[in-house]
Amino acid sequence: MADKLGIYIHIPFCRSKCDYCDFYSLAGRDDRMDQYQKALLSHIKETAPLAQDFPVDTIYIGGGTPSYYGAKRLKELLGVIRKLYKVEKDAEVTVECNPDSVDVKSLKILRKAGVNRLSMGMQSANACELERIHRIHTPQQVNEAATAARKAGFTNLSLDLIYGLPGQTMDSWKDTVEHALSLIPQHLSCYGLKVEEGTPLAARVAQGEVLPDDDQQADLYLWTVGRLERAGYPQYEISNFAKPGFASRHNLRYWLTQPYIGFGPGAHSDFGGRRYSFVRDLDAYIQGVLQGGDIIDESEIIPKRERCGEYLMLRLRTVQG
C-alpha cells in the first residue's frame, strides 16, 4: 500500500504583517489574488498525476492569512483537490484564520467545502500585548470568532498562543491561557517568541527593547505544560497540546517524516525521496507556473542514513519520542 500523503497550500496574503513574522507573507498585494488563484489551480492540476497512487489524509491551508484570501477561493481549491487527488473521507482538512477575517457566513462556506479543523491565531488575550506586535484583532474578536466557528458547525478548533511577548508577565500569560481555555478549543499551540532576523521586532530589539529572557520564558513554558495537562490537554509535542483524539495529524506528519506536497511561494515538499521548496516570491511563482518556468528554489535527495537520523531527531520533539 502506498504511503499516505499530506497536502499543504500556502496563502501569502495578509491584511497587515505582524512584527515578529518571518513567514513568506505580504500585505497590500490583494490585486494579485485572482492571478495567484489561477496559478495555484494550475499547479495543483499539473502535480496530480504524480500523486495519483497516494491516498491523501491531511490537507493544510496556511499563510499568511487564508481566511483573508476568501472562503470562496479556498472552496474552489479544495474542490479541485478532491476531484483530482484521492482524498480520504475522514481526511483532516485545516484552514488557518485570524479572528478579524472570519464570520459565520464565511465559515459555513468552508465547513460545507469539507474543512473540519480551524487553526486560529489568538496569540494573546491582552490588548496591549497584541498592539505591541501589531496584531490587528482584539480579544473580543477572538471570542466572536470562536462563537462563529461553533455556529458554523466546527467541532475541532485550535488556538495559537505566544509566550515571551514584549511586556508580557507571568500574570498576563496566565490570563491569556485561561481565556483560551474558556473558549473550549480542542487543541492549543503555545509557541515561545523567536526574534527572527530581518523582522521589525528584531530591529526593535536591536534598538534596546527588552523581552522576557530565557529563564522567564522557561518559567512560562513549564507553567503552561502543567496547567494544560490539568485542564485535559496533554502535551504531545514541544509546543502542542490537545484533548484526546485531537492532535494535529498534519503537523505530526512533519515530525514523523511522512510525505507531503506543498503549493505556493515558499512552500516545502518531501515527496518521492526528494525534498524541495519553491521560490519565496509571489510574482516569480505566478509567472513560473503560468508560463512554464522554473519555480524550484532548493532541491535535494536525502540519503537513507540521513533520513534515519532526521527521523530520530524529529521524533524527539514528540512526547512519545
Tell what function each PLM region has.
Residues 9:
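Conserved N-terminal Rossmann-fold NAD(P)-binding element of oxidoreductases
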Residues 12-25:
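Local cysteine-cluster metal-coordination motifs and their immediate loop/turn environment
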Residues 2-5, 25-49, 54-321:
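C-terminal scaffold of the Radical SAM
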